[in-house]
Regions:
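Short amphipathic helix-loop junctions that connect adjacent transmembrane helices
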Residues: 198-215
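Helix-to-loop junctions at the C-terminal end of transmembrane segments
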Residues: 12-29, 228-247, 337-338
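Loop-to-transmembrane helix entry/capping segments in MFS-fold secondary transporters
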Residues: 89-98, 211-212, 308-318
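C-terminal ends and interior cores of transmembrane alpha-helices
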Residues: 35-55, 252-273, 361
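C-terminal transmembrane helical hairpin of 12-TM major facilitator-type secondary transporters
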Residues: 244-298
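Glycine-rich segments within core transmembrane alpha-helices of 12-TM secondary carriers
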Residues: 10-13, 93-118, 319-330
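Juxtamembrane intracellular "pre-TM" segments in multi-pass secondary transporters
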Residues: 149-181
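Symmetry-related core transmembrane helices of the 12-TM Major Facilitator Superfamily/SLC fold
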Residues: 37-43, 125-143, 344-362
C-alpha cells in the first residue's frame, strides 16, 4: 500500500551519488560535511514522523518515511566513500567488516529498544526517543578523522557530465570487456546465496517451526554467525588478500547453501523438539557464516575497484547492482518454490552460485599481481 515505495531510495542511490562527489559544503570536508547534514536531517525527520498518527495519517507518514530513507541512503553513500578514502587497500577487508558488523549491532539497539518501548509508550514517544539516537552519530561525526586530500571534480564541466564521467572513467580504466565482466560479477557473486535466503523465513515456517523458534534460533544465530564470520574473514584477508579471499569465501558461501537442501529433504516436521532445533541452528549458522565471509570479501573488492575521485558515485552504482538479486529478482523465488518445491529450489540456488565463481578467473585471478595483503 502506501508504504510500498519507502525503501526505493536505497536501490536508486547511484542517481544522486554523483552530486555528493561534485558539490559539498567546505566546513568539514567533502564527506564529513554531507554526513553531518544527512544526520541532522534524519534527526529532524524522525521527530517529524512522530507527530502524525500512523493510522489516520498513513499517507503523510509514508511520505516522511520515504524522505527518511532518502537521507539514510545518502548517509550510506557518504560513509562508504569516506571509509574507502581513509583505508589503504590491505585494510579494506577488516575495515569494511568492522563497519558492517557495527552497522548490524547498532541497528539492534534503537530497533530492539523501539519495539520494546512500543509496548509501553505511544508512537510519538517511541519515535522521539529513536530520533535522539541520532545524536550519537552527529557527535561522532564531529570528531571523525579528516579524509585525505583528493583532487576535486571539475565544477566547470556541464552538469550532465557529473553522471557520465565516473562511468566513462571506470570503463576506460578497466577496458570495456573487463568492465562488463566486473559488472556481471557484481550481479552474480552473491546471486545464489541471496536467492536462497529471500524465502528463508517462509521456508522455516513451512517446515513446521513457530515464531518463537525463529526468534530463538534463526534471528540470534544468523546475527552472531555473520558477525563472527565477518570479523574472522577480515583478519584472514590481511593474510590472503582480497582476490584469494573471494575464491575461498565464495566456495564456502556456495557449499553452505547445501545446508538448506539437507534440511528441505526432511520435509515438514510434525513435531518440533531439540533435534529439529539443532538441525535448524546448524543450517542457519552455516549459511550465515558463508554470508559473513562472502560479504566481507565482496564489499572490500568493490571498494578497491573505485577511483578515489568518484568513490561515492562508483560505490553506489556497484552496491546497487550487487543488491539486484535479492531486491529485484527475489520476487521470483516464490513462484519458483511453488513450481518445484523447496528441495529443488535450493539446488537451483546452489547452481546459480557457480557462474559468479567462474567470473573470478577474469575479475580476481588467484595469483594476480596487486592482490593486496599485509
Amino acid at each position: 500500500g502506501a508504504l510500498t515505495g519507502v525503501m526505493v531510495p536505497y536501490g536508486l542511490k547511484f542517481l544522486w551519488a554523483p552530486l555528493l562527489d561534485r558539490y559539498f559544503p567546505h566546513f568539514l570536508g567533502r564527506r564529513r560535511s554531507w554526513l553531518l547534514i544527512s544526520q541532522v536531517i534524519l534527526l529532524i525527520s524522525l521527530y517529524a514522523i512522530s507527530q502524525f498518527d500512523p493510522v489516520a495519517e498513513l499517507s503523510t507518514v509514508a511520505k516522511i518515511a520515504t524522505f527518511i530513507a532518502f537521507f539514510s541512503a545518502t548517509q550510506d553513500i557518504v560513509l562508504d566513500a569516506y571509509r574507502r578514502e581513509i583505508l589503504t587497500d590491505n585494510e579494506l577487508g577488516l575495515g569494511n567488516t568492522i563497519h558492517i558488523n557495527a552497522y548490524r549491532v547498532a541497528g539492534l539497539i534503537p530497533g530492539g529498544l523501539s519495539l520494546y518501548l512500543a509496548t509501553i509508550y505511544p508512537w510519538e514517544t517511541v519515535f522521539l526517543l529513536t530520533a535522539l539516537c541520532m545524536l550519537v552519530g552527529i557527535f561522532m561525526t564531529l570528531f571523525l578523522a579528516k579524509e585525505p586530500m583528493i583532487a576535486q571534480v571539475d565544477r566547470d564541466q556541464p552538469f550532465y557530465m557529473v553522471f557520465w564521467i565516473p562511468l566513462k572513467e571506470f570503463f576506460q580504466r578497466k577496458g570495456v570487456a573487463q568492465a562488463i565482466g566486473f559488472l556481471l560479477f557484481l550481479f552474480l557473486y552473491k546471486f545464489g546465496d541471496s536467492f536462497a535466503t529471500t524465502l528463508q523465513t517462509k521456508f522455516v515456517y513451512d517446515m513446521g517451526f513457530e515464531k518463537e523458534h525463529i526468534a530463538l534460533v534463526v534471528k540470534s544465530t544468523s546475527l552472531w554467525a555473520s558477525i563472527s564470520a565477518g570479523l574472522v574473514g577480515g583478519v584472514i584477508m590481511l593474510r590472503l588478500g582480497i582476490n584469494r579471499a573471494l575464491w575461498v569465501f565464495g566456495f564456502i558461501q556456495l557449499i553452505t547453501i547445501g545446508g538448506f537442501i539437507w534440511l528441505a529433504a526432511f520435509g515438514h516436521f510434525d513435531q518440533i523438539g531439540a533435534a529439529e532445533l539443532w538441525k535448524l541452528g546448524f543450517v542457519i549458522a552455516g549459511e550465515y557464516i558463508g554470508v559473513g565471509l562472502g560479504t566481507a570479501a565482496f564489499v572490500a573488492f568493490m571498494a578497491r575497484e573505485t577511483n578515489p575521485l568518484y568513490t561515492a558515485t562508483q560505490l553506489a552504482l556497484f552496491t546497487s547492482l550487487s543488491a539486484l538479486p535479492s531486491k529485484g529478482l527475489g520476487m521470483l523465488s516464490g513462484y519458483l518454490v511453488k513450481a518445484v518445491g523447496y528441495y529443488h529450489f535450493f539446488w537451483i540456488c546452489l547452481f546459480l552460485a557457480i557462474p559468479g565463481m567462474i567470473c573470478l578467473f577474469w575479475v580476481a585471478p588467484w595469483n594476480e599481481k596487486g592482490n593486496e595483503k599485509a
